[in-house]
Structures are given as C-alpha cells and as structure tokens.
C-alpha cells in the first residue's frame, strides 16, 4: 500500500511537471515566423505585431467543427480592438481534414462565412509540425501541442504565448473572452 501511494504521488508530481506552463525566455516571437495562407501565399506574421492572436488548429469533419461559428463571432467581436483568429487546418487527428486547400476554403466560406485568416493545411504536432507549433512547444511547453482539433493558443501583443485552451473550451467561453479582455 505504501509503495502504491508513493508511486501515485510521483506520478502526480511528474504530470504537473510535464504539463506545467513554462515561464519562457523566448529566442523568437510569434511575429518572427511566417506561414502560408489557404491560397498558398506567404503570410509574414510580422504584420500582426502589436495584435492579439488566437491560433487554432481546425478541421472540417470533426465533432468540434461547429466551433467555427464561435471563432467567427469572437473575431467579429474583437477585431476592431486588434484581435485576430488564425485557423490552421490539419489532418492529423482522425483524418478529419481530408480536403484540399480549395475545398477547405470553400467549406469555411460556404458553411460558416469565415472572414478570419486560414492557413494552408499543415501538421501541428510531431517532427513534421510547422515551425510555429515547434516554437510554441519549445517556449511554452506541452500544453501548446494540440491533442485534437480546435486546440487554441492565445498569443499576446508582445508575440508571446498568453495561454492555451483545449478543444472542449468553446471560443466564446468566459475562459477565453476574459483572457482576451485582459490583454487587449
């Protein structure tokens, strides 16, 4: 019994250490990167310097896909205050984003009237993850690595990670809107 309790305590300590938020010393900032948009044109993220960003990996055939509505609503609510949503389609979670960039763009515009920027389809975790997601993990830890579609990373005006939100936290939730209000 004593052994099991100690093992459990060690496991809990390991989990908190493994998943804790890192007080990062950034070598690079969010704005020091680029990513291709849905039309395969380079987006220099430096254009968002001084803005607040919600970076979200998205998918068209996921149970969380309805969150596109909340993301668009969030974008409309805060865009005049220097806030942007950037959607990053990825097919890494259950093959739920199988379409081409053209199909993804059409899906987003037709079904959700999306007006916020969408990138081209890219990997968001693992060795082949886009450099932006590798940067996030390096500087903020494992909480930035998406576990499923519609994982959210909030970037502050300084180009640093403010917070992360799992797929179950909806875009218009108090957890997200309070953080945005705090840093805008």
Predicted segment positions?
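Amphipathic alpha-helical repeat scaffolds
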Residues: 37, 57-61
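N-terminal "domain-start" segment that seeds a small globular fold
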Residues: 22-46
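Thiol-/selenol-based redox modules, centered on thioredoxin-like
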Residues: 131-134, 138-184
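Structural microenvironment flanking redox-active thiols in thiol-disulfide oxidoreductases
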Residues: 64-129
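Bacterial N-terminal signal peptides that target proteins for export
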Residues: 1-9
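Local sequence-structure signature of Cys/Sec-based thiol-disulfide redox active-site neighborhoods
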Residues: 49-54
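Bacterial N-terminal signal peptides
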Residues: 9-17
């Amino acid at each position: 019994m004593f052994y099991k309790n100690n093992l459990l305590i060690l496991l809990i300590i390991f989990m908190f250490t493994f998943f804790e938020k890192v007080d990062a010393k950034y070598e690079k900032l969010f704005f020091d990167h680029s990513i291709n948009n849905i039309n395969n044109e380079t987006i220099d993220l430096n254009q968002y310097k001084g803005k607040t960003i919600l970076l979200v990996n998205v998918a068209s055939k996921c149970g969380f896909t309805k969150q596109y509505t909340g993301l668009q609503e969030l974008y409309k609510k805060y865009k005049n205050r220097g806030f942007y949503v950037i959607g990053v389609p990825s097919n890494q979670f259950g093959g739920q984003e199988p379409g081409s960039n053209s199909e993804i763009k059409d899906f987003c515009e037709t079904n959700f009237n999306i007006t916020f920027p969408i990138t081209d389809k890219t990997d968001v975790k693992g060795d082949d993850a886009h450099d932006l997601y590798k940067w996030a993990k390096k500087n903020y830890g494992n909480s930035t690595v998406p576990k499923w579609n519609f994982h959210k990373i909030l970037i502050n005006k300084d180009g640093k990670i403010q917070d992360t939100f799992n797929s179950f936290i909806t875009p218009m939730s108090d957890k997200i809107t309070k953080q945005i209000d705090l840093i805008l």
